[in-house]
């Protein structure tokens, strides 16, 4: 039975964390103490120093030789069960997809163990539970977050290959990635492919950063983007971002802005014949509302500076081609004209600053490209949630699922038709090597990787031969790690204050996400724990830790790879607000 003293211990451990979070929220939302730029600096300090040193402190002081193998087995079994079920669902169900597999896996199995779990479980069950939480943290940092990177990069590789080599992917013998490319996700790092057929008749592909990325930097600056959304960092993968909410629960279709344009141009391949940029018209065109944005150029110009006026004669649509029977040939797309402003300045300057405006008419280039007519809108409002709220075609374009049938816009008058998806992918060895390279580049840029591995190695050595860390090093680390917990919660409060909405994905989706986080995860953990033989207090600890709020790192990955970031944002923010009463309910019920 839970006593008043037990409840007080829990409150003593948790209230200070929420005080730090509320102070940060009020500093931005109510008192306007911090600007978005300053918030970005604080978050960067937390990501680079506070959290990695906090992880190192907990891991290095935990004795790995006394780890509870059954507890670790229960946690591992829970994640494997969820992953297996989601994999079967994604392959057997028409509504399944790799994106939803990743998102649901994150929601159900990856809680905020480091920041919330250790102090909460210590307050509930004592010091030994803190050691159990450290074991979970080690597995998360070294195994499960790495697995998520594998899935994200696999998704990016499939999209890249499906878009650039829809008919010849099976003939690819090698894929070489330039050293400055750190992700295959073209929405974040604008990349292009170059293919060469060698004497063996196989295709050899080179992936490199697109030259358009430099123009994109300055187009964003000239369009007046501010620093409310901190720039993603290749260094940490642990930044806290301000999320731009989308209309659909699953953010697929987007307005055709400069970033989208350069992503399309940047990922072009010169393998097949095409236009000057090598843009291929795929079977699954993406919706665009570029013409709506272009309808009011004066308004945008008055706000962001003077732009050279487009040439109406050059922008006139071409006449439709005549078919053999004399009738106008049905076109499922139209010509899109864009005027690109480029600059030769250094691309490493501030992207989001309010610097000089670029209005040099001589630097303007006209780009003409074919854009397919948009599909009929899905009509899914924020609250209308289903796994099928995006078409099968769009799922094929995004996830590259060769087993799905893409519903494309084809035929006369834009009537929908069916186009088979690519049926071949590069050999498994080529894909495996490609993904391993990209994941390795991600890991070596993440300070949490180093802190976890160094902490684990140090603990293995010092507890084996009874070494003690030199006092000067210990105090140098502790002076920052002691602030890590409070700064992590403070950073989370800043993140919450920067969001336009606490519930960014709609009420129905938020309810579903909370059910997965606080009901499905603990239920699967309970089954896995009982299966491996956990009983008593260990079983209670396993269930309560599975009911912790959503981890922040999965949201960072979701934002970085554009895979349901609104859902993960809601899970982090709203989940943090309701986590304490929910975990207390679990604590009380399990103690009866």
Curated annotation (Swiss-Prot):
Keywords: Auxin signaling pathway, Membrane, Transmembrane, Transmembrane helix, Transport. GO terms for biological process: auxin export across the plasma membrane; auxin polar transport; auxin-activated signaling pathway. InterPro entries: Auxin_eff_plant, Auxin_Efflux_Carrier, Mem_transp_PIN-like. Residues 1-6, 60-70, 122-131, 474-476, 533-537 are extracellular. GO terms for molecular function: auxin efflux transmembrane transporter activity; identical protein binding; protein homodimerization activity. (indol-3-yl)acetate binds at residues 51, 112, 114, 145, 552-553. It comes from the Eukaryota. It is a multi-pass membrane protein. The chain crosses the membrane at residues 7-27, 39-59, 71-91, 101-121, 132-152, 453-473, 477-497, 512-532, 538-558, 572-592. The keyword Transmembrane helix applies. Residues 214-236, 282-331 are annotated as: Disordered. The keyword Membrane applies. It is found in: Membrane. Signal peptide: none annotated. Residues 224-236 have a biased composition (Polar residues). Belongs to the auxin efflux carrier (TC 2.A.69.1) family. May act as a component of the auxin efflux carrier. This is Probable auxin efflux carrier component 1c. It comes from Oryza sativa subsp. japonica.
